[in-house]
A protein has these predicted regions:
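Short Fe-S-cluster ligation motifs
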Residues: 130, 134-151, 181-206
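Alpha-helical packing segments of well-folded alpha/beta enzyme cores
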Residues: 24, 28, 106, 213-216
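Auxiliary alpha/beta "docking" domains used to position bulky ligands
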Residues: 1-99, 138, 147
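Amphipathic alpha-helical blocks and their helix-capping loop/short-beta junctions
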Residues: 168-183, 188
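Long, well-ordered alpha-helical scaffolding segments within enzyme catalytic domains
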Residues: 97-102, 111
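Long, compositionally biased charged/polar accessory segments in the mid-to-C-terminal portions
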Residues: 198-201, 206-224
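Iron-sulfur cluster-binding cysteine motifs and their immediate structural context
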Residues: 105-129, 135, 148-173
Length: 225
């Protein structure tokens, strides 16, 4: 709608993926137990110190791109990772070879130079860190480089050639809140607690909270002045 409105990372438009993926994995575990008997298993969605990208690469799901994200030939990098630990042996697929080649689009496009070398992101320079995890004020040197992102950042994915043919998800819980798609720049400027609760009721944006989001919006306004 409003092309000047602040931007959200695409994963944040629908329900929080932590809840959706955990529910899906628990349902899968129920099915496996019904089929195979009483097997032991636990599911994790960002809730344990598991090197998920490394294990995903080893399992043949994709390769780790220069933007540090897992990339699949079929899906690009627009997908989530979650894990299920089981006490049964499963035969994995073979690891996938790197297909980034000489491409450096993600490195060249990052406005804060957060990708310090291929496959290595300095989190303390990443727009996603500043707009989601940071609890203080946005540093002055960062203002002017946020590229209109108020929550997260997708730049290194948007420029990736492997995402050219990415398709929308079929999962209805990841569909955007209807009100969210119509919000204008002025709507975001005047964001109230009631609107925030309505639009982001089950959203990962709750991690930043209303005050954090308004801080980010103020920083973006200062960029444009």
């Amino acid at each position: 709608s409003d092309t000047e409105a602040p931007r959200l990372s695409q994963y944040a438009y629908g329900e929080d993926y932590h809840f959706v993926l955990k529910w899906k994995l628990k349902e899968l575990l129920k099915w496996m137990r019904a089929e195979w008997g009483d097997i032991g298993g636990r599911v994790y969605v960002d809730s344990a110190p598991i090197l998920e990208r490394a294990w995903a690469r080893q399992s043949g799901l994709g390769w780790i791109g220069k933007n540090s994200l897992l990339i699949s030939k079929k899906k690009g990098s627009y997908f989530f990772l979650a894990e299920m630990l089981l006490d049964v042996d499963l035969e994995p697929d073979a690891p996938v070879t790197d297909h980034c080649g000489t491409c450096t689009r993600c490195i060249d496009a990052c406005p804060t130079d957060a990708i310090i070398k291929p496959s290595v992101v300095d989190g303390s320079k990443c727009i996603s860190y500043f707009t989601i995890e940071l609890r203080g004020a946005i540093p002055e040197p960062v203002k002017g480089h946020m590229e209109n992102w108020m929550f997260g950042c997708d730049i290194c994915q948007e420029v990736c050639p492997w995402n050219r043919h990415a398709t929308p998800t079929a999962e209805p819980r990841f569909s955007p809140h209807p009100r969210l798609m119509d919000m204008t720049n002025s709507d975001w400027e005047d964001l109230t607690e009631d609107i925030f609760r309505d639009v982001f009721k089950d959203s990962p944006v709750k991690r930043t909270g209303l005050l954090g989001l308004k801080r980010n919006i103020r920083a973006l306004r200062q960029e444009s002045e």
